[in-house]
Amino acid sequence: MLAVRRRGLRVLAVAPLRVRGLATTSTEFMEGEALTPKTVGPYMSERLEEFRPERIRNFSIVAHIDHGKSTLADRLLESSGNISRQERESAQFLDNLKVERERGITVKAQTASMLHRDSKTGESFMLNLVDTPGHVDFSYEVNRSLSACEGVLLLVDCSQGIQAQTLATYYAAKERNLHVVPVLTKIDMPHAEVDDSILSLSSLLDVDPDEVLLTSAKSGDGINDVLPAVVERLPPPVECDPAAPLRCLLVDSYYDDYRGTVCLVKVVDGAISPGDKIYSAHQKTKHDVQETGLLLPGRYKTKGLYAGQVGYIIAGMKSTTEAKVGDTFFREGAASADLKALPGFQEARSMVFASMYPTDDSSFDELRVAIEKLTLNDASVTAQQETSGALGMGFRCGFLGLLHMEVFHQRLSDEQGIQVMVTAPMVPYTVIDPNGEHLTVETPGAFPESTKYYEILEPMVEASIITPASYLGPVLALAKEKRGVQTNLVYLEDERIIVTIDVPWQEVVTNFYNELKTISSGYATLNYREIEPQKADIVKVDLLINGKVLDALSFVCHRSRATPDGRALCQKLKRVIDRQQYEISIQAALGGKIFAKERIAPYRKDVLIKSGKTVGGGDSTRKKKLLAKQKQGKRRMRTVANVQLSQDAFWSVLSK
């Protein structure tokens, strides 16, 4: 059977589909004319009430990072007439952020409504597509996108095969009882392993090989089969009642400079129109609906949204903090009519914390405004003002993961033009004091100096690593070095192995991913999920410069790593701190005891030479007075002077 499919692929490779032919699914809608980006909006708006729940399909594209989700989404948008060929070829249409296009990743989930006509029955269907991020840090975005869907396209790059995040998104979809359509992409690549990928899907995920779609978003091969499969194999919105009182699910939100918060919603029951007054089930707030519409993916205003449909509403919210993802909206006055909020509400929880300080103290207000603007579009970032003795005023920010932190840092520079100093990331620890009280510690400064009478709970994750069998030894060695415990080992058909380990979350955010890629020559992939915290011997290491503790450079680690990490940090700081006219002493302390020290020697001016001549001639008393005066001046300078620390000093902590 696989051999037959392989022969079919060869035929496709010889005669690839023409891009112009991709729009066939949209023909004959308007007296024989295909829909275009200018006509698709008016056509759908005029017939919006005709799209009952049974003629709607809500679906997501899920996959590992860089497996081609956004590229496939652009192809589908082109095939349905939402975007032109030129728009599709110029850039990935659903990736709007500069950081997304520079890194080639999706950070912010986007949505687009499409129109498709069934060639067999002639019926037209509304297809609502959600393009989701692929990196594990943004699994929160993936999960909230899945809450608005009844099915997913599980995308697998057949040149790379099933990866760690592929499995994670598949299981997330199955937990929600979503229907899955497997799709292989990049079949036109020279090193594509189509047969092996189909076998892996069949054995690992129990997928019928005959149901796997074969596509190439780059060349257009197989794209015409995707939307018909969505209509035939995915169910319509379930438990939707057009006659029931309004209930709609808040899926996402973003901030518009002119209109305020734009809410992406799925209407579950009833209908919503401009002028309606709505009530938030979790926020307990009331809002007036000013505008409703579809995302095509640009906003297109409509006279309402109906049961089963996904679109946007503008309700006069001034900030995305008023729009909690997963919230339920009722019509005002109906909250007392025994209506239940839709399940799945869960606030994003920060997993990594780091402090951000302006490079110039006078730029603090600019940094505050910049962070406020970015958090309007990313409600999963938390920011709290703090003060450091060494760096002045700044913000303690919480993120979903290390990549999330790096993306936020880059957006501050790209979009707001703000340069900041970022401290080493830290995960939240639970400290149990002698009275049994549980405290969550997010900064090294709040960590107890001595843990003799305290119990520390360390956050843990279950990490799934897919690696070629030849790299199993180095991967297990890395896991042991990071205090990981192996819990499972599964062999795949294509000489790859799934290794499951329980590992401290702090070890994962501290360069674990880069080291894994290095030892596996880039072949290993990583996915993780949070599990129960465990007791651990965690201590705080203080960094002192000229006897002063710098809270911004202190860090928390396991006791076994305190001495080597502290020594390494002192040595790195010695290399990045500029030499001064006075001696600089760099020390690392644990529990008040110094265990590592580095010295930066001062510049020495020869005070015994003036204008090329020796001062005092042969008078030794005069020379001793000059040397003693110089020594006293250097001691005074060391006492009152401040050592200037660059961003390199903080990144040396980050890469320890």
From Swiss-Prot:
Transit peptide boundaries: 1-29
Keyword Disulfide bond carried by entry: no
Amino acids binding GTP: 63-70, 131-135, 185-188
Main location: mitochondrion
Assigned keywords, A-Z: GTP-binding, Hydrolase, Membrane, Mitochondrion, Mitochondrion inner membrane, Nucleotide-binding, Protein biosynthesis, Transit peptide
Compartment annotation: Mitochondrion inner membrane
GO cellular component: mitochondrial inner membrane; mitochondrial matrix
MF-aspect GO terms: GTP binding; GTPase activity; mitochondrial ribosome binding
Reactions accelerated catalytically: GTP + H2O = GDP + phosphate + H(+)
Keyword ATP-binding: no
Membrane topology recorded in Swiss-Prot or TrEMBL: Peripheral membrane protein
CDD domains xref list: EF4_II (cd03699), EF4_III (cd16260), LepA (cd01890), lepA_C (cd03709)
EC number, UniProt record: 3.6.5.-
InterPro entries found in the cross-reference section: EF-4 (IPR006297), EFG_III/V (IPR035647), EFG_V-like (IPR000640), EFTu-like_2 (IPR004161), G_TR_CS (IPR031157), LepA_C_sf (IPR038363), LepA_CTD (IPR013842), LepA_IV (IPR035654)
Residue ranges of domain tr-type G in the record: 54-238
A Pfam family that the UniProt record links to this protein: GTP_EFTU
Source taxon at top rank: Eukaryota
GO biological process, one term: translation
NCBIfam families assigned: lepA, small_GTP
Family classification: Belongs to the TRAFAC class translation factor GTPase superfamily. Classic translation factor GTPase family. LepA subfamily.
Function: Promotes mitochondrial protein synthesis. May act as a fidelity factor of the translation reaction, by catalyzing a one-codon backward translocation of tRNAs on improperly translocated ribosomes. Binds to mitochondrial ribosomes in a GTP-dependent manner.
Name used for this protein in its record: Translation factor GUF1 homolog, mitochondrial
Protein's organism: Phytophthora infestans (strain T30-4) (Potato late blight agent)
